Curated annotation (Swiss-Prot):
The gene is NR1. One of its GO terms (biological process) is malate metabolic process. Its EC number is 1.1.1.37. It comes from the Eukaryota. InterPro entries: L-lactate/malate_DH, Lactate/malate_DH_C, Lactate/malate_DH_N, Lactate_DH/Glyco_Ohase_4_C, Malate_DH_AS, Malate_DH_NAD-dep_euk, Malate_DH_type2, NAD(P)-bd_dom_sf. It is found in: Cytoplasm. The keyword Cell membrane does not apply. CDD domains: MDH_cytoplasmic_cytosolic. PANTHER family: MALATE DEHYDROGENASE (PTHR23382). This is Malate dehydrogenase, cytoplasmic. Coiled coil: none annotated. Belongs to the LDH/MDH superfamily. MDH type 2 family.
Length: 332
């Protein structure tokens, strides 16, 4: 039996992240090596020519899994029948701008794209918001796409999760594939809390706690956390452009694990709609440790939370509650 192609929407597809992401999707990195895809690429009218150039390159690459490409500036056409939507398009924060300066623009973008997904997307469409402020953009999308189940609307904190794994693997000179179960709690912003308490590394003599192996609490509670929190800014400083390759790769990881499942005994970080687990405020999109099976994510329950973690989890939660209020004030 031939496998039916899945339709994958990428918004902001002519941009940096989009350009890194679409070949990964077309190669099967996101949905697996046996899953054909039809790419739907959306961008704004000033980017229409560049978008067409990306479409030409996708045709030229002759990807066996790529069964079609829709490149458009029309949001209704872009959303028609999509099974997965990766929302990369948004109004970027420029130098000297605060989060609150871009909020009104992003609220209006996500309100209109939510309405289009609500009307045209496939019934069980899975949505991943990448554009910043990602958690709050996802919350606005949830508000204006009421028929998409809330569990299907997520935001990207896998990039932060992967950054944390990378820092630990470098510090311990270990393979990154041997490091697991770090947690990103909260907002995809510099208030996020990268938590290594449950994190382990596979060694020659079994799995060991990262805290024990690193044996340097000052680094783990200090520089490690700030490096992960501020990694995006460090990349902008080095490249003069924001992280695109790593963002695209982690977006593929997020969707792949969500659709195909997480390995036994391993969890990942995803921004999901809070149900109040771990005394996190309900009604915001917050990053939790989750396991995935059969296309569904589930928050990992019962992890011990010490006092330091509690404070950091509360602080990032408070920032999200504040962002939510700011976003809602833009709607009136």
């Amino acid at each position: 039996m031939a496998v039916e192609p899945l339709r994958v929407l990428v918004t902001g597809a002519a941009g940096q992240i989009g350009y890194a992401l679409v070949p990964m999707i077309a190669r099967g990195v996101m949905l697996g090596a046996n899953q054909p895809v039809i790419l739907h690429m959306l961008d704004i009218p000033p980017a229409a020519e560049a978008l067409n150039g990306v479409k030409m390159e996708l045709v030229d690459a002759a990807f066996p899994l790529l069964k079609g490409v829709v490149a458009t500036t029309d949001v209704a056409e872009a959303c028609k029948g999509v099974n997965v939507a990766v929302m990369v398009g948004g109004f970027p924060r420029k130098e000297g701008m605060e989060r609150k300066d871009v909020m009104p623009k992003n609220v209006s973008i996500y309100k209109s794209q939510a309405s289009a997904l609500e009307q045209y997307a496939a019934p069980n469409c899975k949505v991943l918001v990448v554009a910043n402020p990602a958690n709050t953009n996802a919350l606005i999308l949830k508000e204006f796409a009421p028929s998409i189940p809330e569990k299907n609307i997520t935001c990207l904190t896998r990039l932060d999760h992967n950054r944390a794994l990378g820092q630990i693997s470098e510090r311990l000179n270990a393979q990154v594939s041997d490091v697991k179960n770090v947690i990103i709690w909260g907002n995809h912003s510099s208030s996020q809390y990268p938590d290594v308490n449950p994190c382990t590394v596979k060694t020659g003599s079994g799995e060991k706690a990262v805290r024990e192996l690193v044996a340097d609490d000052a680094w783990l509670n200090g520089e490690f956390i700030t490096t992960v929190q501020q990694r995006g800014a460090a990349i902008i400083k080095a490249r003069k452009l924001s992280s695109a390759l790593s963002a695209a790769s982690s977006a593929c990881d997020h969707i792949r694990d969500w659709v195909l499942g997480t390995p036994e005994g391993t969890w990942v970080s995803m921004g999901v709609y809070s149900d109040g687990s771990y005394n996190v405020p309900a009604g915001i999109i917050y990053s939790f440790p989750v396991t995935c099976k059969d296309g569904e994510w589930k928050i990992v329950q019962g992890l011990p939370i010490d006092e330091v973690s509690r404070q950091k989890m509360d602080a990032t939660g408070a920032e999200l509650v504040e962002e939510k209020a700011l976003a809602y004030s833009c709607l009136t």
